[in-house]
Amino acid sequence: MSESEIFGKVKDIVAEQLSVDADKVTPEASFQNDLDADSLDVVEMVMALEEEFDIEIPDEAAEEILTVQAAVDFIAGKVKA
């Protein structure tokens, strides 16, 4: 799966989970600062990403995933592994 395919799926999930317009979900968008996610939103989003990509995102890693691109990079590393 290419990084652009991963971004497309992440973008869809983030837009749905956070109830934001998909156009706002850019690689550099911060979940909390730009997309107004609270801590519960982030937990639910991480769970949705884990399910979609059939991966596990440890709590320590989830705390470091602050932007859409960080999520894409983490998932790309797991999917290719």
Curated annotation (Swiss-Prot):
Pathway per the UniProt entry: Lipid metabolism; fatty acid biosynthesis
Pfam families: PP-binding
Subcellular location, record wording: Cytoplasm
Chief localization: cytoplasm
UniProt GO MF annotations: acyl binding; acyl carrier activity
CC annotations in GO: cytosol; membrane
Keyword Metal-binding included in the entry's annotation: no
GO biological process, one term: lipid A biosynthetic process
Processing and modification events after translation: 4'-phosphopantetheine is transferred from CoA to a specific serine of apo-ACP by AcpS. This modification is essential for activity because fatty acids are bound in thioester linkage to the sulfhydryl of the prosthetic group.
Domain Carrier as annotated: residue spans: 4-79
Database matches in SUPFAM superfamilies: ACP-like
Protein's UniProt keywords contain Kinase: no
Modification O-(pantetheine 4'-phosphoryl)serine occurs at: 39
NCBIfam families recorded: acyl_carrier (TIGR00517), PRK00982.1-2 (NF002148), PRK00982.1-3 (NF002149), PRK00982.1-4 (NF002150), PRK00982.1-5 (NF002151)
Family: Belongs to the acyl carrier protein (ACP) family.
Function: Carrier of the growing fatty acid chain in fatty acid biosynthesis.
The name this protein goes by in its record: Acyl carrier protein
